[in-house]
C-alpha cells in the first residue's frame, strides 16, 4: 500500500518540528561557577559603554597566569579553530565584547560607535588592545586579523597590592568626558582610557531628541538653546529654538531666563544692538535673585561697570531686599571701591 505524498510530508514536518522543539527545550545546568558570565556598563555624557565577558578565576594559579598558557604573551597558535596565531581573549569562553553608543577615542585613537570583539596581545611590559568586527566568536580561536578595526598600546600595572580572584572589568577615574576601563586579574591591571567629544555627542543627542515630539515642547527648546550658549556651539540653530520659545504666538515664554538666553545668542552672533534691547526686556522681568546672578556673570566676564549698573538697579527696585546689598558689595569691590563695599557688606549681614 502506497503512502500518499501529503501524509508523508506531514509526517516529516511533524518529526522535524518535534526535534527542534526538544532541542530548544534542552535542560540547562549551571557550569558550577567556573567562568562567570559578566556585564559592566557606564555612561559618559550621552555615551553608553557596555562590556560583556566571562570571568575566569585564578584558582590557585597565582604567579602562573601571565605569559603562560592561561594568558599567553603575543600571538599564539591555539591548536583549534582557524589554527592561526591569535591574541588572548581577555576573558574566557565566548569572545569578550565592548560596545560604544557613540564615536569614542581609545588611548587617543578614534573608534567608531558599535560593538566589537575585544582581544589583547600581552607582552612583558605593554599590551596591544585589539578591537575586531567579529563579536560572535568563541574566545580567540577563530580570530581573523583582517577584521581588526583598531590596535592601540597601553601599559599594564603589575604587582597590584591585592590579588583579584575573578577577572573583572570596572570603571575608574571618570570625568565629564572620559573614563578608564580597568581590567583587573590576579596582580595585574590593564587600563583602557575612553574619551568622548562631549559637545559633539551631546549636540547630536539634542538634535535627535528635538526631531520628535520634544521639538514642540518650549521648555525643551529653551533648555537646548541655553546649553548651546553655555557650550559655545550651534548659535544659529539655538537662536531659532529660543525664537520659538519667546514668540508670543508660539512658546509664549517671556521669562528672564529665556530672554537672557536669546540676548546671549544674539551677542554671540555679533548683533549687539538687538542683544542689548532683549537684555533690557529680560531685566524688566527678572527677580532680585536673577538680577543678582546676572550682575555676578558680568563681573566674571570682566565687565565690572556694567555689573555695577545692574546691582544698583536691583538694589533700588527691590528696596534693599536680600541679596541686593550683597550685590552692591560685590559691585563696589569689583570696581575697586573697598570702602563702599565694606559699607554694603555690613548692610548685608
Please provide the spans of the model-predicted regions.
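Extended, well-structured beta-strand/loop surface patches
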Residues: 52-113, 119-221
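Charge-dense, helix-prone N-terminal extensions
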Residues: 25, 50-51
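Alpha-helical adaptor scaffolds
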Residues: 219-331
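Bacterial Sec-dependent N-terminal signal peptides
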Residues: 1-27
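Short N-terminal segments immediately surrounding and downstream of signal-peptide cleavage
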Residues: 26-45
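TPR/TPR-like (Sel1-like) alpha-helical repeat modules
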Residues: 267, 283-286, 333-349
Amino acid at each position: 500500500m502506497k503512502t500518499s505524498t501529503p501524509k508523508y510530508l506531514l509526517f516529516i514536518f511533524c518529526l522535524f518540528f518535534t526535534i527542534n522543539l526538544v532541542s530548544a527545550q534542552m535542560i540547562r545546568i549551571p557550569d558550577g561557577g567556573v567562568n562567570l558570565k559578566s556585564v559592566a556598563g557606564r555612561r559618559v555624557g550621552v555615551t553608553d559603554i557596555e562590556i560583556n565577558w566571562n570571568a575566569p578565576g585564578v584558582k590557585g594559579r597565582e604567579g602562573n597566569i601571565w605569559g603562560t598558557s592561561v594568558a599567553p604573551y603575543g600571538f599564539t597558535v591555539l591548536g583549534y579553530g582557524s589554527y592561526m596565531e591569535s591574541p588572548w581573549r581577555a576573558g574566557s569562553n565566548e569572545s569578550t565584547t565592548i560596545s560604544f553608543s557613540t564615536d569614542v577615542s581609545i588611548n587617543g585613537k578614534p573608534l567608531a560607535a558599535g560593538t566589537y570583539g575585544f582581544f589583547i596581545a600581552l607582552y612583558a611590559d605593554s599590551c596591544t588592545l585589539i578591537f575586531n568586527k567579529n563579536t560572535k566568536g568563541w574566545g580567540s580561536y577563530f580570530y581573523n586579523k583582517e577584521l581588526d578595526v583598531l590596535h592601540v598600546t597601553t601599559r599594564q600595572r603589575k604587582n597590584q597590592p591585592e590579588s583579584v580572584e575573578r577577572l573583572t572589568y570596572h570603571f575608574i577615574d571618570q570625568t565629564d568626558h572620559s573614563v578608564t576601563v580597568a581590567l583587573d586579574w590576579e596582580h595585574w591591571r590593564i587600563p583602557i582610557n575612553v574619551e568622548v567629544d562631549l559637545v559633539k555627542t551631546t549636540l547630536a543627542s539634542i538634535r535627535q531628541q528635538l526631531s520628535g515630539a520634544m521639538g514642540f515642547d518650549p521648555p525643551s527648546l529653551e533648555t537646548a538653546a541655553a546649553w548651546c550658549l553655555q557650550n559655545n556651539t550651534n548659535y544659529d540653530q539655538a537662536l531659532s529654538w529660543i525664537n520659538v520659545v519667546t514668540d508670543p504666538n508660539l512658546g509664549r515664554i517671556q521669562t528672564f531666563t529665556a530672554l537672557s538666553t536669546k540676548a546671549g545668542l544674539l551677542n554671540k552672533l555679533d548683533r549687539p544692538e538687538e542683544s542689548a534691547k532683549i537684555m533690557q526686556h529680560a531685566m524688566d522681568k527678572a527677580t532680585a535673585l536673577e538680577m543678582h546672578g546676572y550682575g555676578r556673570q558680568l563681573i566674571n566676564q570682566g565687565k565690572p561697570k556694567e555689573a555695577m549698573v545692574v546691582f544698583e538697579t536691583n538694589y533700588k527696585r527691590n528696596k534693599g531686599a536680600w541679596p541686593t546689598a550683597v550685590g552692591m558689595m560685590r559691585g563696589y569691590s569689583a570696581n575697586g571701591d573697598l570702602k563702599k563695599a565694606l559699607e554694603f557688606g555690613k548692610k548685608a549681614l
